Amino acid sequence: MLAGTRLLAQSPVVEVPLEFHDGHGLFAPGYGGVNWERGPNDNDWYKTYQPVKGIPASWKDVKKGNIWIDAHQFAYQNYRAGLLQADVYQGLKEGWKIDTTQLSPKPIRCFVYVVTGTTSDGKQGVLVDTNHDLDFTDERVVYPPTMLSIWKTGPLQEAIVSLPADFYRGGQVVTYPVKVLFALSDGNVLYNYPTYASASIRSGAKPSR
């Protein structure tokens, strides 16, 4: 075992360029749930909610919430803004192992607001605040397919929304495009990021150091 460890330690590091693709590739996709807003009772996140506008008046059973693109950054910036209690944040910091040296001290676009409801034609629609202005008036209605249909046919482009998001890298805030795929499971709106990477290396190629 020790000999194998020494050999591994002496092996050169191989750097392989990645190529990113839309979809899930050969991987089984996982999904997350939207953080829907709820009342103030026993709700540590209540003060982090922001008012939005532009929700169609004809929609019924409307729910409003957000997706945390970077949950660590979201918790940290709301704590610094006084919108998340210190004891709650400290618990998250320990449980999530939040490293504040890797996070922006100023608020950035690390989340996105989402609303869902029953449209006038009886379908379940989703609106995403892709330009982060808290106004859904100019947003495209997405009709999420069921997870079963996605498993059979793959991600549907009309169920994918693209938006800019901010990240803290190397002491600077950088912006990257993020794609979000929405799906329905028993009426619940779920999402994931339909992007995967591939790499290839020629047999006998010399690794870079």
Language model features with spans:
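Sec-dependent N-terminal signal peptides
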Residues: 1-3
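Sec/Tat signal peptide C-region and signal peptidase I cleavage site
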Residues: 5-9
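Calcium-binding acidic motifs and repeat modules
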Residues: 10-209
